[in-house]
Structure formats: structure tokens, C-alpha cells
Amino acid sequence: MGKTNDWLDFEQLAEEKVRDALKPPSMYKVILVNDDYTPMEFVIDVLQKFFSYDVERATQLMLAVHYQGKAICGVFTAEVAETKVAMVNKYARENEHPLLCTLEKA
């Protein structure tokens, strides 16, 4: 009788492990923050280059950044969001712009 209980405990533990492994990953919003110095054309370039937006959608998001102070560029897993933030910030610095890209939990 003890062996049956051991098997059920193992089966329950295995199901819990599988359930935990199948949980969707945490998601993060990547956000561009407005400043008074970065040209609008550069923001559009960033949105096209790093987020694959067409010129129309990139322009809409650039205007949201400009008038609302910030805009969400996309929602990604932690690793992808962190990479995009780092790449955008590096690109902005390389081009001598103070544009800031951040992330926050979705």
C-alpha cells in the first residue's frame, strides 16, 4: 500500500513541475521617454530600426512620445526587452542624442 502512495506523490510532483515549466514568461513594456533635444526624425528612425514599424506607425508613436512624454514601443519577454533597451540607448548615445529607452513590467 505504501508503494501506491509513493507513486501518487511522485505523479503529483511531476504534474506540478510541468505546470510550473509551462507558465508563460513575464512580459515587459519597452518605453521611449521624451526629451527636448532628440530630433523627431531620429525617434522615427529608432522605431523603424529596432521595432520594425513602418514610417506611418513610427510617426504616430513618435508624436505620442513628443506630446504625452512617453510611449510604449512594444511588449516583450524580459530578455528581448532588456536587449532592445540596451540597443536603443547605445544607438542614441553613439549618435549623441539623450533619447532614453526604459522597460517596466507589463
UniProtKB/Swiss-Prot annotation:
Pfam family, one: ClpS
GO-annotated biological processes: protein catabolic process; proteolysis
InterPro entries: ClpS, ClpS_core, Ribosomal_bL12_C/ClpS-like
Residues in coiled coil: none
Function field: Involved in the modulation of the specificity of the ClpAP-mediated ATP-dependent protein degradation.
Complex formation: Binds to the N-terminal domain of the chaperone ClpA.
Homology family: Belongs to the ClpS family.
Protein name (database record): ATP-dependent Clp protease adapter protein ClpS
